[in-house]
């Protein structure tokens, strides 16, 4: 038989450096998205209170 040698995939252990880099990248991306969400909420809140202070809106129901 000529097919005595078969190329098998060799399994390697986990690469610590690669896992640290992937974890760091995912953490930074998730943190950046979280910060952008909070900046957007802060902008909305600041805009609401500015409009409330200027009298453009009111929280009291008019009868």
UniProtKB/Swiss-Prot annotation:
Q: What is this protein called?
A: Cytochrome c oxidase subunit 5C
The superkingdom of the source organism is Eukaryota
Where's it found, cell-wise? Mitochondrion inner membrane
**Role this protein plays:** This protein is one of the nuclear-coded polypeptide chains of cytochrome c oxidase, the terminal oxidase in mitochondrial electron transport.
Keyword tags = Membrane, Mitochondrion, Mitochondrion inner membrane, Transmembrane, Transmembrane helix
PANTHER family in the record: CYTOCHROME C OXIDASE SUBUNIT 5C-2-RELATED
**Family membership noted in the UniProt record:** Belongs to the cytochrome c oxidase subunit 5C family.
Task: Please give the organism.
Answer: Oryza sativa subsp. japonica
Note whether Magnesium occurs among the keywords: no
Chief site of localization: mitochondrion
Upper classification of the source organism reads: Eukaryota, Viridiplantae, Streptophyta, Embryophyta, Tracheophyta
């Amino acid at each position: 038989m000529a097919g005595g040698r078969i190329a098998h995939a060799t399994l390697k252990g986990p690469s610590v450096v690669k896992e640290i880099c992937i974890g760091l990248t995912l953490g930074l991306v998730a943190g950046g998205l979280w910060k952008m969400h909070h900046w957007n909420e802060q902008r909305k809140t600041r805009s609401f209170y500015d409009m409330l202070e200027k009298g453009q809106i009111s929280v009291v129901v008019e009868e």
